[in-house]
C-alpha cells in the first residue's frame, strides 16, 4: 500500500486545488526554501492519518484554513489516494482507495471512496493495512529527531512500551478493573435485596387473615353504593327529559328571531357592501374632480404665462421690425454712396494706372539716357583706367555677363509675379462665386425654415388633439382599474370567509392540488402531462350550479364532498397524489375518479308536487352525471318535514327540507338552525360571480390599456415629429448663422485678395522698367566692345551727349507733370478706397446682416408657436371644464345616493335593534330556566358530595374511585348573550348525559356484587341506605391499614427471590473470569515488552553498523533493585530506562564507547535515527514520512542515511524533505515547493532542478 496522489485545498499555506501525483513506490524527496510550505505538505498527510489531529476544537479547525488576500476559504480538504494493488486494504477490491478529510468552521468529515464514514473506520482501516497506533514513527516531523536524541533513558523505555503495545494492554486492564468494580457493586446490591425480600415474606404471611374479614365488609358496602347510584340515575333521566322539552321550545322561538335577524344582518351586509362600493366611487369622483381642478389651475397658469410671452414677443417684433426698416433705409443710402464712389473709382483707376505707367516709363527712360551719357563721357578716362583695348573689352564682357544674370533674374521675377497675379485673379473669381453660392443657399435655407415653421404649428394642433384623447383613455382605464380593485376585494373577502368555514386540511388540499396542476403545466414538455392537465376537472362545487332556495339542502347532503376533486381516471388521481406528496404539501385531498364512480339506481318518485329529487335541482354538465348522482342518489327535497316527507322515507328515500332538516330512511332525524351566512355554496357562487366580473373587467382593462398605449404612441409619434421639426428648425437657424459667418469670412478674404493686386501690378511695372534699363545698358556695352580707346570724345559722341541731356531735361519736365497728376489721382483714389473699405463696406455688411438676421424669423416662429399653444390650451381648458362640470354633477348624484343609502342603513339598524331586544327578552327566559337548572344541579351534587365523603373516609380505597364535582354557577350571575345561554342549556343536558355515564361507570367499578343486591336493597329508603353505608364505613375503618394485595405481593416476592439468587451466582462467575483475564493481560504485557526490546536491540546493532561501518552500538535495559515489599512482582516492573552505548572511529583511530550524553549533536541525531530505523524494522509500515531528518548530520552520515533509506525502500515507500543534496542522489522522484503571494505551490521537478532548489536554499539560508 503506497501513496499514489495527494490533493490539498485550502489547508494552511495551500489555497487552490494542489494536486501532487506520480509518487514513486520507493523513495521521494520534497525540496524547497525554508518557509515555502514543505512541512505543511507533511502536516496535510498527518491531518488525514495521524491521531495528532484527531479531536480539533473550532478555533483549531479555523487555524487550519488558508488565510490570504482574496475570498475567504470556507473549508480545508485533503485527499490521499493509495495504491491498493497489493490488497493490503482487504475491505476494498479496487486497485485505488481514496481517503478524504474535510474540516470547516462547524464540520469535521471523513470520506472513503466518496462515502462519508466516522473517524474510527479510517483508523481501523489504517491499522488493518499495517499502521500501528502504538508506533507513531512512520511519520517523523521536524524536532522529533532532536527530541529523541536528547531524551533521558526513561523516555526511551516509555517509547519501547508504546511500541510493544502495552498501552492496549493497559487500556483493556483498566476496562476490566472497571467492570470488576461494577460487578462487585451489583453483587452487594443483590445481597441487600435478598435480605429485604426475606423480611417482606415474613410480614405478608401475617397480613393474609385481616384481608379476608375486610373483603366481607367491602361487599356489603359496594351493594349499598350500587343501589344509591341506581336511584341517582333514575332521577337524572327524569330531569333530562324535562330540560330537553324546554330546550326544544326555546330553540324554536329563538330560531325564528335569529332567522329574521340573519335576514336583517344580510341586508345590512349588502347595504354596507353597496356603501363601500359607493364610497369607492365617491373617492374616484373626488380624485377626478381634484385632478381636473388641478389641471384647470395649471392650465390657467400656463395661459397667463403664454399671454405674457406673446405680449413680450409682439413688443420685440415691433422693435425689431422698426429697426429692420431703418436698416433697410440706411442700407439703400449706403449702397448709393458705395455705387457713386465705386463709379468714381472705376473712372480714376484706369487713368491712374496709365499715369503710373507713364511715370515709370519716363523715370526709366531718364535713367537709360543719363546712363548712356555717363558711359559716353566715361570713354575719356579709359586710357587711364585700362591699359589696353583687350583689358577694357574683358571688363565690358564681365559687366555684360553680370547684367545678363540680372536680366534673367528680373525676367524670372516678372514671370513669378505675373503667375501670382493670374492666381489672384482666379482666387478673386472663385471667392466671388462662393459668395454668390452662399447667398443663394442662405435664401433657400430661409425658405425651408419658414416652411418647417408652418408645419410645426400644424403638428402642435395635432398633438393637442392626441393628448386630449390619451388623457380621456387614461381616465377610462383608471375607472376600470378601480372596479377591478373593488372586485378583487370582494373575491378576497369571499375566499377569507370560505377559508374560515371549510376545514383547514380540506382547504389546504384544494390549494395544494392547484399548485400540483400548475407544476404539471410548467413541466409539460412535449405534452408528457397532457393526460393529467386535461383529465383534471376541478372540485364538485366548481362543477355545479344550485338555485338559491335549494343551496342549504344540497350543502347538508353533500357536506365535504363538495370539495372532492373530479378526475377522469384513478390513474390521474394517483399521479396528482404522488406529486402532492413529492412537493410535501399540507392538506387532505379526496377524488371522484369518473372511471370508478358508480351511481345507485334512482327509484321512481310517486306523485308529489311538493317533492323533487335532489339531482333535478342541480345544474351540471352531462359528463359529470355519475358523480352528482352518487352524492344525491335517492335524496328528495321537500319544503317541510311533514307527513308527506315521512311517507317518502317509508318508501326508502332520504328526505331533506329546504331549510336543511333531514329524515333518513333508517329512521334518524336531524335538524336545527343553520346559519345561511356560512353557506359554502352561497360563498362559492358569490366568488364565481365576482370572478366572472373580474374576467370581464380584465378583458375591458386589456382593451383600455391597448387604447391608452395606442393613444400614447400616437401622441408620442406626433411629439417626436414636433421635436424633429423643432430640431430641423434649429438646424436651419444654426446653418443660417454658419452660412452668414462663412459669407462674411469669404468676403473678408475676397477684400484681402483684391487688395494684393495693385501692389503686385506696381511691382511688375517696376521690374519691366528695370529690365529696359538693363537691356539698354547691355546693348551699350556690347556696342562698345571692339571700339578704339581715345582720350577725347568724337564730335558724334559729343552731339549724342547733348541730345541725350536735352532729352533728359524734357522728360524730367514731363515726369514732373505726370507725377503731380498721378499724385493727385492717387490721393483721391486712396481716399475713396479708404472710405469704401473702412467705412462703407463695413457699414453695408453690418446693415445687410441686420436686414438678413433670422432672429426675426425665430421670434416670429416663437410667436406662432405661442399662439398655437394658447389656442390648444384654450381648447383643452374648455374640455377640462366640461369634464369638471360632469364630475361635479356626478359627485352631487353620489352624495344624494349616499344620503339615501345611509337612511336605508339607519332603518335596517333600527330593525336589528328591535330583533336584538326580542333576543334580550328570550335571554331573560333563559336566565330563569338556567337558575332552575342550577337549583336542580346543586341538589344532585349535594347528594353526590355526601356519598363521596362517606366513600373517601376509607383511605385504602382512595385511588379506586374518583368523582368530578363542578362548582355550582351563581344564580343571577352576569347575564350572557342568548347564544351562550342556549349553548349552556345544551351543555347542561350533555353534562347530565355525562353524569349518567359517570354513574354507570362508578356502578361498573363496584365490581361483582352479591346476588341478593337488587332484591335486598332495592326498596330501602335513601336515609336507611346512607345509614347502612355509614355503618360499613365505620367497620372498615378498623381495617384501614389492611394490605388488600397481600397474597399477590407474597407470590411476587417469592419469584423475585428466586431470580435474584440466580443473578447472584452469575455475578460471582463473572468476577472470577475478570480476575483471570487481568492475570493473562499482565503476563502478555511483560512478554511483549521483553520481546520488543530484544527485537529493537538486535535491529539497533545492525542499523548502527550499517550507518557507521567502523563503529558499533548497543542498547541496555537498566533496572533498579527489588525492595522487600515487592517480592513476587515481574522483573519488567523493575525496569527504569534504556541506555544506548555507541562508539565512532575518529580520524585518530579513537574507538571509545560512549553514552548519548557524551556525543556531539550530529552523533546524537545519527543515534536517534538508528533507534527510529530499529523501531520501524520491528514494526514496519507500508510508507514513511521524514521531515528534514538529516538537518543536524554531517555529509558522511547523511550519505549513510540516504543509503539506509534506499535499502529500506525495497519494502516500503519513503517521502522525505531535505535541504541537503545527499538524499537527492538515491531518490527516484522529486518535488519542488514554491511560495508565491502567500500561497504554496508544489510541482514535480527533475533531479537537476531539485539540486538547484537545494543550492538556492543554501545560498539564501
From Swiss-Prot:
A motif (DA-box) lies at residues 1159-1193. Involved in chromosome cohesion during cell cycle and in DNA repair. Involved in the repair of double strand breaks during mitosis and meiosis. Required for chromosome segregation during mitosis. Central component of cohesin complex. The cohesin complex is required for the cohesion of sister chromatids after DNA replication. The cohesin complex apparently forms a large proteinaceous ring within which sister chromatids can be trapped. At anaphase, the complex is cleaved and dissociates from chromatin, allowing sister chromatids to segregate. Keywords: Cell cycle, Cell division, Chromosome, Coiled coil, DNA damage, DNA repair, Mitosis, Nucleus. It holds the Pfam family SMC_N. It is found in: Nucleus; Chromosome. Disruption phenotype: RNAi-mediated knock-down is embryonic lethal and results in aberrant chromosome segregation during mitosis. RNAi-mediated knockdown at 20 degrees Celsius results in the mis-localization of lab-1 in germ line nuclei. One of its GO terms (molecular function) is double-stranded DNA binding. SUPFAM superfamilies: P-loop containing nucleoside triphosphate hydrolases, Sec2 N-terminal region, Smc hinge domain. The keyword tRNA processing does not apply. One of its GO terms (cellular component) is cohesin complex. Residues 534-645 form the SMC hinge domain. The keyword DNA damage applies. Belongs to the SMC family. SMC3 subfamily. Component of the cohesin complex, composed of the smc-1 and smc-3 heterodimer attached via their SMC hinge domain, scc-1 which links them, and scc-3. Interacts with scc-1, smc-1 and tim-1. This is Structural maintenance of chromosomes protein 3. Residues 188-332, 406-450, 677-826, 857-930, 1023-1085 form a coiled coil. Its main location: nucleus. GO terms for biological process: cell division; DNA repair; establishment of mitotic sister chromatid cohesion; mitotic sister chromatid cohesion.
Amino acid at each position: 500500500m503506497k501513496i499514489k496522489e495527494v490533493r490539498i485545498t485550502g489547508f494552511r499555506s495551500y489555497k487552490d486545488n494542489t494536486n501532487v501525483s506520480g509518487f514513486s513506490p520507493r523513495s521521494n524527496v520534497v525540496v524547497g526554501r525554508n518557509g515555502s510550505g514543505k512541512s505543511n505538505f507533511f502536516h496535510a498527510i498527518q491531518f488525514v492519518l495521524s491521531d495528532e489531529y484527531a479531536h480539533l476544537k473550532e478555533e483549531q479547525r479555523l487555524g487550519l484554513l488558508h488565510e490570504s488576500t482574496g475570498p475567504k476559504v470556507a473549508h480545508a480538504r485533503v485527499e490521499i489516494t493509495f495504491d491498493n494493488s497489493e490488497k493490503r486494504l482487504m475491505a476494498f477490491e479496487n486497485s485505488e482507495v481514496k481517503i478524504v478529510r474535510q474540516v470547516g468552521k462547524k464540520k469535521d468529515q471523513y470520506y472513503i471512496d466518496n462515502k462519508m464514514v466516522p473517524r474510527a473506520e479510517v483508523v481501523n482501516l489504517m491499522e488493518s493495512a499495517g499502521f500501528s497506533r502504538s508506533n507513531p514513527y512512520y511519520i517523523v516531523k521536524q524536532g522529533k529527531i532532536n527530541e529523541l536524541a536528547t531524551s533521558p533513558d526513561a523516555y526511551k523505555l516509555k517509547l519501547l512500551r508504546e511500541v510493544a503495545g502495552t498501552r492496549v494492554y493497559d487500556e483493556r486492564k483498566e476496562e476490566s478493573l472497571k467492570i470488576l468494580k461494577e460487578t462487585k457493586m451489583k453483587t452487594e446490591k443483590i445481597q441487600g435485596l435478598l435480605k429485604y425480600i426475606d423480611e417482606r415474606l415474613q410480614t405478608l404471611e401475617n397480613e393474609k387473615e385481616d384481608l379476608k374479614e375486610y373483603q366481607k365488609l367491602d361487599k356489603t358496602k359496594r351493594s349499598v353504593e350500587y343501589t344509591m347510584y341506581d336511584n341517582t340515575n333514575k332521577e337524572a333521566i327524569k330531569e333530562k327529559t324535562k330540560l330537553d322539552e324546554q330546550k326544544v321550545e326555546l330553540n324554536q322561538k329563538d330560531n325564528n328571531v335569529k332567522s329574521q335577524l340573519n335576514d336583517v344582518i344580510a341586508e345590512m351586509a349588502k347595504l354596507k357592501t353597496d356603501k363601500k362600493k359607493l364610497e369607492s366611487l365617491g373617492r374616484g369622483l373626488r380624485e377626478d374632480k381634484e385632478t381636473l381642478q388641478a389641471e384647470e389651475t395649471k392650465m390657467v397658469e400656463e395661459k397667463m404665462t403664454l399671454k405674457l410671452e406673446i405680449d413680450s414677443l409682439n413688443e420685440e417684433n415691433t422693435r425689431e421690425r422698426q429697426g429692420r426698416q431703418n436698416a433697410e433705409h440706411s442700407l439703400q443710402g449706403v449702397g448709393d454712396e458705395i455705387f457713386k464712389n465705386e463709379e468714381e473709382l472705376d473712372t480714376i483707376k484706369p487713368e491712374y494706372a496709365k499715369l503710373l505707367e507713364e511715370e515709370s516709363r519716363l523715370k526709366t527712360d531718364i535713367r537709360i539716357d543719363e546712363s548712356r551719357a555717363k558711359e559716353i563721357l566715361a570713354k575719356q578716362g579709359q586710357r587711364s583706367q585700362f591699359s589696353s583695348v583687350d583689358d577694357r573689352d574683358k571688363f565690358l564682357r564681365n559687366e555684360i555677363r553680370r547684367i545678363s544674370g540680372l536680366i534673367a533674374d528680373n525676367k524670372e521675377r516678372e514671370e513669378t509675379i505675373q503667375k501670382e497675379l493670374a492666381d489672384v485673379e482666379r482666387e478673386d473669381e472663385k471667392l466671388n462665386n462662393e459668395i454668390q453660392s452662399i447667398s443663394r443657399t442662405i435664401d433657400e435655407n430661409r425658405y425651408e425654415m419658414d416652411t418647417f415653421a408652418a408645419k410645426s404649428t400644424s403638428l402642435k394642433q395635432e398633438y393637442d388633439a392626441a393628448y386630449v384623447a390619451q388623457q380621456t383613455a387614461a381616465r377610462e382605464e383608471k375607472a376600470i382599474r378601480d372596479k377591478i380593485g373593488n372586485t378583487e376585494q370582494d373575491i378576497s373577502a369571499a375566499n377569507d370567509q370560505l377559508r374560515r368555514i371549510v376545514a383547514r386540511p380540506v382547504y389546504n388540499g384544494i390549494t395544494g392540488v392547484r399548485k400540483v396542476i400548475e407544476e404539471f403545466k410548467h413541466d409539460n414538455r412535449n405534452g408528457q402531462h397532457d393526460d393529467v392537465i386535461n383529465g383534471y376537472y376541478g372540485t364538485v362545487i366548481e362543477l355545479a350550479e344550485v338555485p338559491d332556495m335549494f343551496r342549504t339542502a344540497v350543502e347538508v347532503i353533500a357536506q365535504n364532498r363538495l370539495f372532492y376533486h373530479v378526475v377522469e381516471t384513478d390513474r390521474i388521481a394517483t399521479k396528482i397524489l404522488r406529486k402532492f406528496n413529492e412537493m410535501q404539501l399540507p392538506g387532505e385531498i379526496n377524488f371522484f375518479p369518473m372511471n370508478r364512480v358508480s351511481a345507485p339506481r334512482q327509484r321512481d318518485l310517486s306523485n308529489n308536487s311538493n317533492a323533487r329529487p335532489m339531482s333535478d335541482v342541480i345544474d351540471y354538465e352531462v359528463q359529470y352525471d355519475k358523480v352528482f348522482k352518487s352524492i344525491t342518489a335517492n335524496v328528495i327535497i321537500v319544503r317541510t318535514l311533514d307527513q308527506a316527507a315521512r311517507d317518502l322515507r317509508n318508501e326508502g328515500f332520504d328526505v331533506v327540507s329546504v331549510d336543511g332538516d333531514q329524515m333518513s330512511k333508517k329512521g334518524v332525524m336531524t335538524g336545527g338552525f343553520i346559519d345561511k351566512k356560512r353557506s359554502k355554496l352561497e360563498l362559492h357562487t358569490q366568488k364565481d360571480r365576482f370572478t366572472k366580473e373580474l374576467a370581464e373587467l380584465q378583458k375591458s382593462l386589456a382593451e383600455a390599456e391597448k387604447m391608452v398605449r395606442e393613444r400614447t404612441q400616437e401622441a408620442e409619434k406626433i411629439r417626436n415629429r414636433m421635436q424633429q421639426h423643432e430640431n430641423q428648425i434649429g438646424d436651419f437657424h444654426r446653418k443660417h448663422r454658419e452660412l452668414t459667418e462663412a459669407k462674411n469670412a469669404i468676403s473678408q478674404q475676397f477684400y484681402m485678395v483684391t487688395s494684393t493686386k495693385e501692389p503686385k501690378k506696381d511691382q511688375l511695372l517696376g521690374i519691366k522698367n528695370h529690365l529696359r534699363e538693363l537691356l539698354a545698358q547691355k546693348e551699350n556695352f556690347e556696342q562698345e566692345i571692339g571700339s578704339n580707346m581715345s582720350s577725347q570724345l568724337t564730335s558724334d559722341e559729343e552731339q549724342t551727349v547733348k541730345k541725350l541731356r536735352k532729352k533728359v531735361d524734357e522728360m524730367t519736365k514731363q515726369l514732373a507733370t505726370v507725377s503731380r497728376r498721378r499724385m493727385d489721382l492717387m490721393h483721391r483714389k486712396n481716399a475713396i478706397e479708404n472710405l469704401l473699405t473702412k467705412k462703407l463696406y463695413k457699414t453695408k455688411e453690418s446693415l445687410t446682416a441686420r436686414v438678413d438676421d433670422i432672429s426675426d424669423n425665430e421670434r416670429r416662429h416663437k410667436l406662432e408657436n405661442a399662439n398655437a399653444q394658447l389656442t390648444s390650451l384654450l381648447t383643452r381648458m374648455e374640455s377640462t371644464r366640461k369634464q369638471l362640470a360632469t364630475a361635479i354633477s356626478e359627485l352631487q348624484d353620489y352624495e344624494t345616493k349616499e344620503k339615501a343609502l345611509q337612511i336605508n342603513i339607519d332603518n335596517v339598524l333600527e330593525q336589528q335593534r328591535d330583533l336584538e331586544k326580542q333576543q334580550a327578552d328570550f335571554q331573560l327566559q333563559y336566565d330563569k330556566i338556567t337558575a332552575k337548572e342550577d337549583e336542580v344541579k346543586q341538589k344532585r351534587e349535594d347528594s353526590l358530595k355526601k356519598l363521596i365523603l362517606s366513600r373517601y373516609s376509607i383511605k385504602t380505597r382512595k385511588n379506586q374511585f374518583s368523582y368530578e364535582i363542578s362548582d355550582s354557577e351563581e344564580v343571577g350571575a352576569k347575564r350572557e348573550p342568548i347564544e351562550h345561554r342556549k349553548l349552556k342549556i345544551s351543555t347542561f343536558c350533555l353534562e347530565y348525559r355525562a353524569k349518567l355515564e359517570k354513574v354507570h361507570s362508578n356502578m361498573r367499578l363496584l365490581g361483582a356484587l352479591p346476588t341478593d343486591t337488587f332484591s335486598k336493597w332495592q326498596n330501602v329508603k335513601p336515609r336507611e341506605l346512607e345509614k347502612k353505608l355509614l355503618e360499613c364505613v365505620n367497620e372498615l375503618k378498623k381495617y384501614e391499614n389492611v394490605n388488600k394485595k397481600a397474597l399477590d405481593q407474597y407470590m411476587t416476592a417469592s419469584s423475585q427471590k428466586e431470580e435474584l439468587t440466580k443473578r447472584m451466582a452469575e455475578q460471582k462467575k463473572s468476577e472470577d473470569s475478570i480476575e483471570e483475564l487481568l492475570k493473562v493481560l499482565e503476563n502478555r504485557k511483560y512478554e511483549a515488552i521483553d520481546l520488543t526490546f530484544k527485537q529493537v536491540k538486535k535491529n539497533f546493532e545492525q542499523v548502527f553498523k550499517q550507518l557507521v561501518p567502523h563503529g558499533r552500538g548497543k542498547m541496555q535495559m537498566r533496572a533498579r533493585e527489588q525492595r522487600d515489599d515487592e517480592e513476587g512482582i515481574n522483573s519488567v516492573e523493575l525496569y527504569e530506562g534504556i541506555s544506548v552505548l555507541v562508539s565512532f572511529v575518529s580520524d585518530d583511530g579513537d574507538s571509545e564507547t560512549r553514552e548519548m550524553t557524551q556525543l556531539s549533536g550530529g552523533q546524537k541525531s545519527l543515534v536517534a535515527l538508528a533507534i527510529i530505523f530499529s523501531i520501524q524494522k520491528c514494526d514496519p509500515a507500508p510508507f514513511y514520512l521524514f521531515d528534514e531528518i538529516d538537518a543536524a548530520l554531517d555529509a558522511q552520515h547523511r550519505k549513510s542515511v540516504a543509503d539506509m533509506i534506499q535499502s529500506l525502500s525495497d519494502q516500503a515507500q519513503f517521502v522525505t524533505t531535505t535541504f541537503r543534496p545527499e538524499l537527492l542522489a538515491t531518490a527516484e522522484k522529486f518535488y519542488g515547493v514554491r511560495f508565491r503571494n502567500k500561497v504554496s505551490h508544489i510541482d514535480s521537478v527533475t533531479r537537476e532542478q531539485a539540486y538547484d532548489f537545494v543550492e538556492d536554499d543554501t545560498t539564501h539560508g
